[in-house]
Amino acid sequence: MTFSGFPPSAPRLYEELAAGNSKESWRLRHRAVYESDVRAPMEELAVELSAHFAEYAGGVRLLGPVRDTRMSHDKSPYKTYQGAYLDVLPALGFWVHLDREGLYASGRWYPYGGAEVARYRAAVEEEDGGAELAGITARLTGLGFTIGGDRLATRPRGVPAGHPRLELLRHRKIDAGRRLGPGPALGSAAAGAFVRETWELVRPLLDWAAARGLTPRPRGDRGADTPS
């Protein structure tokens, strides 16, 4: 079927789940709504996005609704969002999720360890590469994107306080995205267009990271750099 949006019951499910996240409430109240109003439309959206971005192998993949709580103090059994992703390279790709605040779409770089972060910081400090990334993120910010992701609260070791790209150097991960809130657009095909446009707009960011080898290298080729 063709993707035609998410009904109002979809974000409302996550509003209700935040207030009562239990296996019993899921079985009695939420599972059927999840399958019909969240999972099914997200699968339709994934098919359309996979076709549009067909140059990336593997297609868009959906996450399941159950949380892995083994290493978490929070034992709530179910996720409060429905996510889907398309990887361009390991630790680099596109993301979309639906939650109680609507739809969020982004491009993200999420390295596994210190070697990738060290290479990222070297690329940002390099004048041409750093200036290019600053320009990309400035354009995205001007289009309503938020440049988020895990980052240091202070400065990386050895970086002066007055460095022109200090904010970028603080990043250990990058998530550049924007949100479509609940409303008529979320319940129509416009939601799919929003995600496609968002992913197209973040391509330069992903291309920048891919061109500089900021994704995990084969095991025998990994450096020992450890960022601070």
Give the label of every model feature segment:
Residues R70-G129:
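Aromatic- and glycine-enriched beta-alpha-beta binding-site module
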Residues R31-S76:
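Gly/Pro-rich turn-and-neighbor structural signature
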Residues R27:
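Phosphate-proximal small/polar/acidic motifs at interfaces that engage nucleotide phosphates
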Residues G59-L62, D68-K79, A84, A185-L186, ...:
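N-terminal low-complexity, intrinsically disordered segments
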Residues M1-L17, N21-K23, A40-A46, F53, ...:
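Long, solvent-exposed, polar/charged low-complexity segments
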Residues R31-Y34, V38, W109-Y110, A118-E125, ...:
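Short histidine-centered catalytic/ligand-binding loop motif
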Residues V117-L152:
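Surface-exposed, charged, gly/pro-rich loop-and-adjacent secondary-structure segments at domain edges
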